[in-house]
């Protein structure tokens, strides 16, 4: 679209003026409780006059984003703006705004939705939840990904400008595919850090001004919800039962992932004391980093039932260590979330409804499947990343009974059912469905100054 690209280029113009640039907020600004804010960010953005450079620290990649219609930039010009941090870092170049993209997972989708970019997503994750993503999948818009059919994936990759991917472990090695972009939102350690990745996404589409506005509101809404925990605040545990499988022994688990413990603290709750659990369960309790080698990711605690004479005995020991927990969030996998009930919970954890445990006696047993797709995929793994304020609101209601509605948390002890999202509510015209041949135009970020014709030259 002519309105998205330069028709005449001037080396005297600044096509990305400071008024529309993004800057990654200092970590100390991302929470009122400064003691729990992490100081590490996973990306940074620097601007030249006609290009911008995103440095993605986890993948050790730089993405050079050149305004369409501007001439190519040299390595020396890029180095003057953002030199490579190390010899391990590599560079990839894209023309922005991107026209058509693919997304490997659900992680990126809520960011794209908030920026109004659904009409630029040609292929999306087959596990997507949002109405328009489900509509796209039904029109053969499902992305094959690394584990799909290689021939189909190659065809899909060839038809798009970029493929947004993520990884689940560190270090996340750079990809040799020149179109792949690593989106590290799910690896950033804090709820607001994660939400700030909307600025990363926006830079590929010249939507920085919109991203600044969205994130400012998210930051304000989240901080307005923060509640410092009192001494007698409810104690919360994120638990899971893992059945025997070819890759896992039967076990009871507790997640102390960094983002989860921060959410609980911000909601005015108390987290488990890992040392106390270790004292109670001894060497039978295995404690490890959620992401191996990354302490900031938090800890996962595993108690194998094989260390006891029976599952029942293991359950007794496990819940003796959780005897003062007021609220549990059960993350046990269920292929059909709507069929997972309070009875399922009791069976999995070898408990009875007559138990004196506070979370059973007071009906405080929640799951994270409060909103799902028609194909049983959880919105928790999609929109939560972009909307930490929604999660915090859910948790405050679960802990303190604020009377608000909840999007992600479902109280199975109170027989609540999941809300199911379908494609019928999507009204966006999508490329995968041949609703439209072009995407909605994205205006350039600058207003051209008056430049003499002698200083201007058309771009070849």
Where are these regions (language model features)?
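N-terminal ligand-binding lobe of clamshell/alpha-beta domains
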Residues: 1-458
């Amino acid at each position: 679209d002519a309105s998205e690209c330069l028709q005449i280029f001037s080396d005297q113009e600044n096509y990305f003026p400071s008024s529309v640039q993004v800057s990654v907020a200092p970590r100390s600004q991302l929470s009122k409780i400064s003691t729990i804010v992490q100081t590490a960010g996973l990306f940074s953005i620097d601007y030249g006059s006609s290009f911008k450079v995103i440095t993605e620290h986890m993948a050790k990649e730089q993405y050079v984003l050149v305004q369409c219609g501007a001439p190519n930039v040299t390595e020396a010009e890029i180095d003057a703006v953002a030199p490579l941090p190390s010899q391990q870092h590599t560079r990839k170049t894209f023309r922005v705004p991107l026209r058509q993209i693919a997304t490997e997972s659900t992680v990126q989708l809520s960011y794209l939705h908030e920026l109004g970019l659904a009409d630029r997503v040609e292929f999306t994750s087959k596990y997507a939840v949002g109405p328009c993503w489900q509509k796209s999948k039904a029109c053969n818009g499902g992305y094959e990904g690394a584990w799909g059919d290689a021939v189909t994936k190659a065809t899909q990759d060839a038809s798009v400008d970029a493929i947004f991917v993520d990884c689940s472990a560190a270090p996340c090695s750079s990809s040799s595919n020149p179109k792949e972009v690593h989106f590290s939102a799910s690896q950033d350690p804090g709820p607001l850090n994660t939400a700030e990745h909307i600025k990363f996404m926006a830079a590929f589409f010249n939507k920085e001004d919109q991203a600044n506005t969205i994130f400012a509101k998210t930051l304000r809404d989240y901080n307005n919800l923060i509640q410092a925990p009192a001494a007698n605040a409810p104690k919360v545990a994120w638990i899971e039962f893992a059945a025997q499988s070819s890759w896992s022994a039967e076990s009871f688990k507790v997640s102390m992932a960094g983002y989860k413990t921060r959410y609980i603290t911000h909601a005015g709750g108390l987290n488990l004391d890992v040392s106390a659990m270790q004292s109670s369960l001894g060497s039978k309790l295995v404690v490890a980093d959620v992401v191996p080698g990354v302490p900031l990711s938090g800890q996962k605690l595993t108690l194998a039932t094989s260390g006891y004479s029976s599952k029942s005995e293991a359950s007794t020991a496990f819940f003796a260590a959780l005897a003062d927990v007021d609220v549990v969030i059960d993350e046990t996998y269920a292929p059909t979330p709507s069929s997972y009930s309070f009875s399922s919970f009791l069976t999995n954890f070898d408990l009875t409804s007559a138990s004196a445990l506070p979370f059973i006696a007071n009906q405080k047993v929640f799951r994270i499947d409060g909103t799902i797709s028609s194909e049983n995929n959880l919105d928790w793994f999609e929109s939560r990343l972009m909307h930490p304020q929604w999660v915090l609101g859910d948790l405050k209601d679960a802990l303190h009974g604020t009377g608000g509605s909840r999007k992600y948390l479902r109280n199975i002890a109170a027989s609540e059912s999941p809300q199911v999202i379908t494609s019928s509510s999507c009204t966006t015209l999508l490329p995968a469905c041949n609703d439209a041949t072009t995407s909605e135009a994205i205006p350039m970020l600058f207003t051209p100054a008056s430049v003499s014709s002698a200083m201007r030259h058309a771009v070849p």
